[in-house]
A protein has these predicted regions:
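Flexible, low-complexity linker and terminal segments
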Residues: 4, 194-246
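Conserved thiamine diphosphate
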Residues: 79, 127-179
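Structural motif
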Residues: 35-38, 80-83, 108-112, 151, ...
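ATP/pyrophosphate-binding catalytic subdomain of soluble kinases
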Residues: 159-213
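Active-site diphosphate/adenylate-binding microenvironment
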Residues: 2-62
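Thiamine diphosphate
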Residues: 42-119, 171-174
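Short catalytic-loop micro-motif centered on adjacent basic/acidic residues
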Residues: 9-11, 84-86, 160-165
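Short, hinge-like loop/turn segments at secondary-structure boundaries
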Residues: 55-57, 102, 127-131, 179, ...
Length: 246
């Protein structure tokens, strides 16, 4: 009911761990799959929606254009929950303009980037999120500074930003649940190692490197249920509000 078709991704791909976390989060939240619309672009990550929530709606768009499709679908049907899946190539290169403006619109959706720092479908070239100095499978060293998607989302005013690792299910599942509860644009950047082209010594997106350099900034083991805070005010006026944490 919550799972999808059999994955055709490489054995050990971080994306499959993210798919499993999405299944777990949706099951824990009792989200009905037929009320979910999955949207994606092009890339290994964009194949992933086929591997979870098989009874949901889905649309595989052209490269980098998932946000536009999500915007149109959201305007046409406000009753569905929109889950966008993208990759670092799909978002940080050809889709960068779309990414910027979907944040600007504060579209109500979860936008998840499966970030492996390379183009897995085209033999592992460095993507725009590959760190300077990181080495790929051929030993080539990346000379360019990485685009930090989480920092960029914060700078652009995204109302929910989170970052995690595909190998840390205990953090990722609660983070997904928090993003799904958010009333607005929720962005998740998940480091997801490519076992075929970018899991080698010298890569900063490998399983070993990420595990050695992980640093949790907060615990995500409990997400309290809260009532949505609403108010009304005259144009040009200011009203003080008390948030849940006081």
């Amino acid at each position: 009911y919550y799972e999808g078709s059999l994955s055709t991704l490489c054995a050990g791909c971080g994306h499959d761990s993210i798919n499993a976390a999405i299944v777990e989060a949706c099951w824990q939240m009792n989200i009905e799959p037929h009320k979910v619309a999955k949207l994606s672009g092009i890339g290994c990550s964009s194949k992933s929606p086929a591997y979870f929530l098989s009874n949901s709606h889905g649309f595989n768009s052209v490269h980098g254009r998932m946000p536009s499709v999500a915007t149109g679908a959201n305007l046409a049907n406000r009753d569905l929950f929109y889950f966008g899946v993208s990759g670092d190539g799909d978002t940080a290169s050809i889709g960068m303009g779309q990414f910027v403006h979907v944040i600007r619109r504060n579209l109500k959706m979860v936008y998840l980037v499966m970030n492996n720092g390379c183009y897995g479908l085209t033999k592992g070239q460095d993507s725009a999120t590959a760190d300077a100095g990181s080495k790929n499978k051929t030993g080539h060293e990346n000379l360019f500074a990485a685009i930090d998607l989480a920092s960029l989302a914060i700078e652009l005013g995204a109302t929910f930003v989170g970052q995690s690792f595909s190998g840390d299910k205990e953090q990722l599942v609660p983070l997904l649940k928090a993003a799904m509860r958010h009333n607005g644009f929720a962005f998740l950047n998940v480091i997801s190692p490519c076992v075929t082209f970018n899991n080698n010594t010298g890569s900063t997106k490998s399983y070993d490197y990420v595990r050695e350099h992980m640093a949790a900034t907060a615990t995500m083991d409990f997400i309290p249920m809260m009532h949505e805070i609403k108010t009304s005010y005259e144009s040009g006026s200011v009203k003080d509000l008390t948030m849940h944490d006081g």
